[in-house]
Amino acid sequence: MEKQNLKNTEVNLIYGVDDDLDLPKKVLFGLQHIFAAFGGIIVVPLVIATSLGFDSKVTTALISASILGSGLATIIQAKGVGKVGARVACIMGTDFTFVSPAISVGSVLGLPGIIGATILGSLFEVILSFFIKPLMKFFPPLVTGTVVALIGLTLLPVSIDWAAGGAGSANYASLENLAVAMFVLVITLLLNNYGKGMISSASILIGIVVGYIVCIPLGLVDFTPVKEASWLSFPKILEFGVTFDAKAVMAFIPAYFVATIGTVGCLKAIGETSNIDIGDKRVAAGVLSDGVGSALGGLVGSCPNTSFSQNIGIISLTKVASRHVAVMAGILLVILGFLPKVAAIITGIPNPVLGGVGIMMFGTVAAAGIRTLSNIKLTERNLLIIAISMGLGLGVTFRPDVIHNLPEAIRMIFSSGISTGTIAALILNAVLKESPTSMEFENMYDEEKKAS
């Protein structure tokens, strides 16, 4: 059993990590996770397919395969198979970290090259998982709290873009979009705070459904993709072939390294919101699951899979940390991988609706990190580590062009604000030592606390 966190950091959960629920509740809570993650699951293959000029048949197959691969990887991560899987409520999908290398490889070797690099590159993450234990000593609460806060803060701009209608949309920041987003935010907030039982726990799902319905008469829902989508689709193993190339694999290695760092941070964050201490064995099992899930994803024709940070906030808001809910979400994703028409309905959720719930979800993740940091002694050294790590992580997030002139391999590693902030926190925590003045202040603080 994993030991529980300190009481002052605990979340008042309705269902713990290993608590099972009846089927209707698992489906209901599982759908909430799917709605939060679905946009991220399909947008990466869509961006890759569009950038490489794939035809509609290949694009549709790639998206269906990504949904199926995400479901399989989620089931393995949440349920666990032997030593594989962290066995927590973790949703899996393809991260934007893999977009650049996939386009680079695909422009030369096509989709078979991407699939080959995905499968062989996953072995790097599998190997890396066996070295997690000695690395975990570099992740004290100071580092994990900073990383968790960064996960939420770096995702908030995404939710704001959603609320405005989506980055690059013709009606960006229109009053209609903002009104819908604020309406959904208020509905979700009221249900979560004042609702009882299932109403409170299902507040995100209810908010999305209500927002979706409101958007239909406003003309914000396009049902064309639903009409055009087929009812059934059966992704095939290596349907478009596979090409193994050493250079292609090397292009994916930095992205897999960044994904590993992100997974460690996500699992730690899930631990914080689930009232468990995610130990090194569980983290190693989670990273191993990333590698296995990516290999499976490649086999069914999708890109690598890694943990999705946007689902962490759902645990805090719904007070449901059950991994069985995540398993159900994985099962539903697998089913959706075979039902393009149903998947298209979910894909059609308007951006302002996602923005309304996203602001609440991602803000909750940031607050969880701040709560962790509030339980450590904020000495001058610790404040410096938090400040610089946050500054660099948010700086890269808000001004991504600042690393434009770096070599491609280095640029890939620091392209994510989460990875940049995490690396900074790890290095600073290892290098910076407490000054004599800070240590003296800390001793005085301890004595005063004991005296009181």
From Swiss-Prot:
Q: Name one Pfam family in it.
A: Xan_ur_permease
Output the superkingdom of the source species: Bacteria
For this record, the Gene Ontology CC terms, alphabetical, are: plasma membrane
This entry's Gene Ontology molecular function terms read: xanthine transmembrane transporter activity
Q: Which UniProt keywords apply?
A: Cell membrane, Membrane, Transmembrane, Transmembrane helix, Transport
Q: Does the keyword Cytoplasm apply?
A: no
Instruction: Please state where this protein is localized.
Output: Cell membrane
TM ranges are 34-54, 58-78, 83-103, 108-128, 138-158, 172-192, 201-221, 250-270, 326-346, 348-368, 383-403, 412-432
Q: Which InterPro entries match?
A: NCS2, UacT-like, Xan_ur_permease
The annotated topology with respect to the bilayer is: Multi-pass membrane protein
The principal location of this protein is: membrane
Q: Which NCBIfam families match?
A: ncs2 (TIGR00801), NCS2_1 (NF037981), pbuX (TIGR03173)
Task: Give the UniProt family note.
Answer: Belongs to the nucleobase:cation symporter-2 (NCS2) (TC 2.A.40) family.
Q: What is this protein called?
A: Putative purine permease CPE0397
Q: Which organism is it from?
A: Clostridium perfringens (strain 13 / Type A)
Lineage, opening ranks: Bacteria, Bacillati, Bacillota, Clostridia, Eubacteriales
Q: What gene name is listed for this protein?
A: cpx
